[in-house]
Swiss-Prot record:
NCBIfam families for this protein: D_Ser_am_lyase, PRK02991.1
Organism listed in the record: Escherichia coli O6:K15:H31 (strain 536 / UPEC)
PROSITE patterns in alphabetical order: DEHYDRATASE_SER_THR
Protein name: D-serine dehydratase 2
Subunit comment: Monomer.
Length: 442
């Protein structure tokens, strides 16, 4: 971006200056609306989420057999919800900032099959595509026991088709493992940030991995191009896919059920704050949409991004969405949080969700490493760096009087609050890699 344009952008949006300086930044969104006002802009409904829920239930018998690690939950891919009181104390001590309410962790980091939040959307979109093909071919009806998809006849049928996706790692893992298991030929286009172990794991499942020297945007673009030349190839588009988004959104109702089981209340007097790491936006966008449908105006969602990749904060704050990238303003998009190393946000998610998100913030790689170490020490839970992005949120909310006033929160409401950090990945990180992460924390 030339200087004159840059100066005018900063004059209009002074916060951009802090982003360019790679400062840890928080922006509380002045444009939030009620769910009723914001919902029409999403372009999806409660019914769409129910359909996704029903589809996952139809596939449960198949998943329980195809992936024995899901048998205990009857083929439902869901993660634990745990309180982390020792971590809450540690954060308060390190940052000299009390956190009112209770701190919880949602362990999508330990979801079965692929060990990340992407096991929600990625697996769902592969299943939805497989179902569509099998129904159209007359090989399946909605009433069937879907475990029949494990038969050689179906393997043979699906092997005529292929799937392609561009990814920094975790989405590729989910889609690659699931597609290969069903019988699709699958190609994952991986950006330069992708970890070597993720590529190796995919190859061990028979997935074709194409590597790029450039970032996520290039990997997605190349994947899209490669798929266009083959009519039997289906491209899963992380930047624009409504199907992926709906796969994530099912988490809302599931979390509501977990809250009920644990006797946790969410209402006007007991607000829920949720902190979601954000890359291109599909995962956190879909989850936030599901949470809003489940808890209405009593849930407040925040997106967390690395200081080197603040694409969603930049896009929503300036209203430019996918028309601007972090590279346009001189930021390098290089971060240890490989899952969040995205320079240009999803325009679909930004425009759909901008009224339903309470805020956005950035944090440095070092902050993620520090918190990664504290969580391992205090709670014995090991995550990858990007999964800690949400952990910086509760302090930011509790420290901001202006945000609390904007939403009219009383001290008592904040004392009764639940702060939920969405841990997005790390359950499958190899031991030696994890030791390197732990060594970087202070």
């Amino acid at each position: 971006m030339e200087n004159a344009k840059m100066n005018s952008l900063i004059a209009q949006y002074p916060l951009v200056k802090d982003l360019v300086a790679l400062k840890e930044t928080t922006w509380f969104n002045p444009g939030t609306t009620s769910l009723a006002e914001g919902l029409p802009y999403v372009g999806l409904t409660e019914q769409d989420v129910q359909d996704a829920h029903a589809r996952l239930s139809r596939f449960a018998p198949y998943l329980a057999k195809a992936f024995p690690e899901t048998a205990a939950t009857g083929g439902i891919i869901e993660s634990e919800l745990v309180a982390i009181p020792a971590m809450q104390k540690r954060l308060e001590k390190e940052y000299q900032q009390p956190i009112s309410g209770q701190l919880l962790l949602k362990k999508d980091s330990h979801l079965p099959i692929s060990g990340s939040i992407k096991a929600r959307g990625g697996i769902y979109e592969v299943l939805a595509h497989a179902e569509k093909l099998a129904l159209e071919a007359g090989l399946l009806t909605l009433e069937d026991d879907y475990s029949k998809l494990l038969s050689p006849e179906f393997k043979q049928f699906f092997s005529q088709y292929s799937i392609a996706v561009g990814s920094t790692g975790n989405l590729g893992l989910s889609i690659g493992i699931m597609s290969a298991r069903i019988g699709f030929k699958v190609t994952v286009h991986m950006s330069a940030d992708a970890r070597a172990w993720k590529k190796a794991k995919l190859r061990s499942h028979g997935v074709t991995v194409v590597e790029y020297e450039q970032d996520y945007g290039v990997a997605v673009e190349e994947g899209r191009k490669a798929a266009q030349s083959d009519p039997n190839c289906f491209f899963i588009d992380d930047e624009n896919s409504r199907t992926l988004f709906l796969g994530y959104s099912v988490a809302g109702q599931r979390l509501k059920a977990q809250f009920a089981q644990q006797g946790r209340i969410v209402d006007a007097d007991n607000p829920l704050f949720v902190y979601l790491p954000c890359g291109v936006g599909g995962g956190p966008g879909g989850v936030a949409f599901g949470l809003k449908l489940a808890f209405g105006d009593h849930v407040h969602c925040f997106f967390a991004e690395p200081t080197h990749s603040p694409c969603m904060l930049l896009g929503v704050h300036t209203g430019l969405h996918d028309q601007i990238s972090v590279q346009d303003i001189g930021i390098d998009n290089l971060t240890a949080a490989d899952g969040l190393a995205v320079g240009r946000a999803s325009g679909f998610v930004g425009r759909a969700m901008e009224r339903l998100l309470d805020g956005f913030y950035t944090l440095s790689d070092q902050t993620m490493y520090d918190m990664l170490g504290w969580l391992a020490q205090e709670e014995g839970i090991r995550l990858e760096p990007s999964a800690l992005a949400g952990m910086a949120g509760p302090q930011r909310v509790c420290a901001s009087v202006s945000y609390q006033q904007m939403h009219g929160f009383s001290a008592e409401q904040l004392r009764n609050a639940t702060h939920l950090v969405w841990a997005t990945g790390g359950g499958m990180v190899p031991e030696e890699e994890m030791e390197q992460y732990l060594a970087k924390g202070h």
